[in-house]
Amino acid sequence: MKIWVDADACPKVIRETIVRAAERTGVECTFVANHLVPVPKRNNIHSIQVPSGFDIADDEIVKRTEPGDLVITSDIPLADEVITKGGQALSSRGELYTKETIKARLNIRDFMDTMRSSGIQTGGPSALSQTDRREFANHLDRLLAKR
């Protein structure tokens, strides 16, 4: 298992949790973003900077993901592509997307996009809470223990 992180929108506190887990377990971890993401100098922790542009980082992650890999993302379409390739996808709030749940999440996302494009203000996600951080760390630990 390798960990791929959609680092463009990944909160710093979640990136730090991922780095600690990678250091502790030795799992290979790569942060992918269209900007420089500083990572500690470790043999198993890497950063890839892709050109700026719509979904370029997502496309790079999908291209490199192999069955059994874990992708950290809150991007629902990216999670769907990863699951289709046989990978796992975990949100920065600790929600594990599955084959059974991802289509419903895509439908909700598309509905909210339609609402926003028609001028209805839907608001954004709430701030990352301490509970979200704990859920993420616990779920990540469980996934790494299974590998």
From Swiss-Prot:
InterPro entries recorded: UPF0178
Pfam family, one: DUF188
The organism's place on the tree of life at top rank: Bacteria
Similarity comment: family membership: Belongs to the UPF0178 family.
Protein name (record): UPF0178 protein VS_2364
